[in-house]
């Protein structure tokens, strides 16, 4: 309080503003620098090392879009860059979008047929679209199912999917061809196919799948994340242990 003559002046205390915290931008990281994503699928990118608001952009939204929460969605086959801007810096993830699953993905695997020629068993592989076969034979209907497979230590000529995956391929190659959004699961006793003799013989520990409608391609992987078996199935959920046992595969 300052008194001047009869006047009294009250001085308010001076409050210094809080210093603006300095952000260590070297600690700010983006969860992925590169990404493979299937058209129609989504993967969420995350920024760590800061609490500031992040601004997300895609260099080509016709290929992939990104939401304000970092959710990247594949639109069509191609490449784009998703950028996260925060605290004065920009972080970039290169996104490669692969084509969505279609009937073409079931072209190459074919179907194994055994027949006898002059008393000798002859195994052949028919090059027929798996989906076409299932629809023609009625396997695609309610309650129906069908499957065919190839294992590393099985019999017959080694086959491959329409995107080039075969026994011996790496998990990283599967992700490159089908997208990082695929989920890897552990083999379980509850899962019918995980109990197959060939699954155990090849020491498969886990598997991943890609789907088109009611049709699936499953890749069995060993401890080194290499493909040891491929199963193509229609209405896989209808296939139980009793069916595999009756076919002699358990």
Indicate where each model-derived feature is located.
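Short secondary-structure transition/capping segments
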Residues: 162-168, 234-235
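A cross-family detector of function-defining hotspots
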Residues: 102-143, 171-242, 247-250
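Intrinsically disordered, low-complexity Ser/Thr-rich linker and spacer segments
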Residues: 21-25, 158-160, 238-245
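Acidic/histidine-rich, surface-exposed loop or edge segments in extracytoplasmic proteins
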Residues: 147-160
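Extracytoplasmic soluble-region selector
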Residues: 5-101, 120, 131-136, 141, ...
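Second-shell loop/turn segments in exported
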Residues: 98, 158-165
């Amino acid at each position: 309080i300052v008194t001047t003559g009869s006047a009294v002046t009250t001085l308010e205390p001076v409050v210094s503003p809080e210093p603006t915290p300095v952000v260590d931008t070297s600690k700010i990281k983006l969860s992925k620098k590169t990404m493979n994503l299937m058209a129609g699928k989504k993967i969420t990118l995350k920024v760590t090392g800061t609490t500031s608001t992040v601004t997300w952009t895609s260099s080509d939204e016709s290929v992939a879009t990104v939401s304000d929460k970092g959710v990247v969605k594949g639109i069509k086959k191609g490449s784009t860059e998703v950028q996260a801007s925060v605290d004065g810096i920009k972080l970039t993830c290169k996104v490669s979008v692969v084509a969505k699953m279609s009937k073409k993905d079931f072209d190459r695997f074919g179907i194994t047929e055994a027949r006898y020629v002059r008393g000798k068993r002859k195994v052949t592989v028919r090059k027929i679209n798996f989906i076409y076969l299932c629809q023609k034979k009625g396997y695609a209907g309610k309650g129906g199912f069908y499957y065919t497979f190839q294992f590393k230590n099985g019999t017959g000529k080694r086959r491959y999917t329409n995107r080039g995956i075969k026994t011996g391929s790496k998990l990283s190659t599967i992700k490159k061809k089908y997208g990082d959004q695929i989920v890897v699961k552990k083999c379980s006793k509850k899962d019918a196919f995980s109990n197959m003799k060939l699954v155990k013989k090849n020491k498969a520990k886990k598997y991943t799948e890609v789907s088109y409608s009611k049709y699936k391609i499953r890749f069995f992987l060993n401890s080194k994340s290499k493909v040891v078996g491929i199963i193509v199935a229609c209405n896989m959920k209808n296939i139980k242990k009793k069916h595999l046992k009756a076919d002699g595969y358990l």
